Amino acid sequence: MANFHNRDPLSPAFWDERFEKQFTPWDQGGVPARLRRFVADSPAPLRCLIPGCGSAYELVFMLDHGWDAMAIDFSPAAVAAARAVVGARAGQVVEADFFAWQPAAPLDLIYERAFLCAMPRAMWPQVAARWAQLLAPGAMLVGYFFFDDNAKGPPFGISREQLQALLAPHFDCLADEAVDDSIAVFAGKERWMRWRRRAD
């Protein structure tokens, strides 16, 4: 394993160092099957945000299907990796702080993949509150949620009770499905979930 100087996942330098040393065990190297089906089955293109986008393979897939999708990350090295993957549409990848970024138009969907579990547990209420701020009633929070009780991270796993407590004040869970194509770090511990923003 590579030696790292930065141990604070709330610092962009933490993620820069891992991308620069090519230590990215959370990177699937492609688009997960359940997301492929979700995008293909969507009756119309959606306006979507991918926070903490990493290499942003999903962004390419969404754009290819006509979605108005944007990916953000606060790590310059992650943004560079994502722009290399996205190519000619690199303008859809923005270096930004999720907690400060503002959409140009209302979002239909936020895609969750290894963003919540990248955050220390003390930050989770702020993440959930920001999701709720960015999504109007009826809009969706969709993606993969990592369930584990390991004290160390990232990834920081969540319990079902914790996730329910975080999201139930603002969201209704519409889907909760097993995942059969997880990469090693998430294998057997993640679920595909779809949450709908409820009116406050």
Residue ranges with predicted function:
Residues 108:
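Conserved acidic residues
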Residues 111:
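A conserved beta-strand element that flanks and buttresses the S-adenosyl-L-methionine
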Residues 1-50, 54-105, 119-200:
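Class I (Rossmann-like) S-adenosyl-L-methionine-dependent methyltransferase catalytic domain
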Residues 114-118:
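Short catalytic micro-motifs in class I SAM-dependent methyltransferases
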